[in-house]
Structure formats: C-alpha cells, structure tokens
Amino acid sequence: MEPSRILITRKRSFKNLFALCLCVSVVGLLAGCDVQRRKSDAELGLNPQQIAGRKIYDNLCDRCHAPYSSRGRQGPSMKGVFRRQYLPMSGMPANDDRVTDVIRMGRNKMPGYSQVLNQQQINDLLAYLHTL
C-alpha cells in the first residue's frame, strides 16, 4: 500500500474514533440529565411543617415513591399528587382525607403506617406532599 493511502486510512480511522467518542460522551451526558440535584429546604421555600414532612417522606416513602419520577421505584411518583383529580392506581379522589387513609391503612403493596405515624406526623407529611 502506498504511504499516502496509509495516511488517509489512518486519518479516517481517527475521525471515526473521535466521532464514536463524541457520541458516547453525549449519550452519557443526556443519561445523567434525568438525575436531579436534591434542592435544600430553603431553595424549595418549605415552612417548618413541610420540612418535618419531608423528613418523614425521606425516611418512609422515598424507598418506593420518588418525589419527581417513578423510574426504578415500585410505587407511583408523588409529583403533583394533589394537582390530579384522582390518585394514581387507586382512582380515588386526590384529597387529604383519601391520602390520609392510604397512609394509615396502606394499599396494595404499600404498608399502613397507623402504628408508626401520629396524626401530627401525617399532617406534616401531607403538607410536604402538597409542595410536590
């Protein structure tokens, strides 16, 4: 093979390798875009009751219900749960009374928390859920 053809072939290989690396980098960056940085209580403008509810949510609910996405979780996302007319999966009205019942008694695979949370803690949790 002529030296000039070898040089052209190497340049093409380098360009293809560069294009492949660029594509892999872009895909990697886009995949990371779904991950949201956790905002502080102050950034979210939470009041003391909502902050207490957020702590309860983090300890008990976040395992199955992501606040902003359902990816990789068993339960539905809680984002905008009170902006919907009906609760996801159950179809019950989305209001404080119904959500309180679900928190206390559980539903489907979700355990009830009537023996774990008192009424004030449930109210705190509801206050936080209203912010999502």
Language model features with spans:
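Residues at secondary-structure transition points
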Residues: 44, 48-51, 69, 73, ...
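Electrostatic cytochrome c docking/interface patches
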Residues: 34-56
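Cys/His-rich metal-chelating microdomains
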Residues: 36, 67-68
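C-terminal motif of bacterial Sec signal peptides marking the signal peptidase cleavage site
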Residues: 29-32
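Soluble periplasmic/extracytoplasmic beta-strand elements of cell-envelope proteins
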Residues: 63, 77-80
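Extracytoplasmic electron-transfer domains, predominantly the class I c-type cytochrome c fold
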Residues: 73, 80-132
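Short, low-complexity, charge-dense intrinsically disordered segments
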Residues: 1-27
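The canonical Cys-X-X-Cys-His
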Residues: 53, 57-67, 125-129
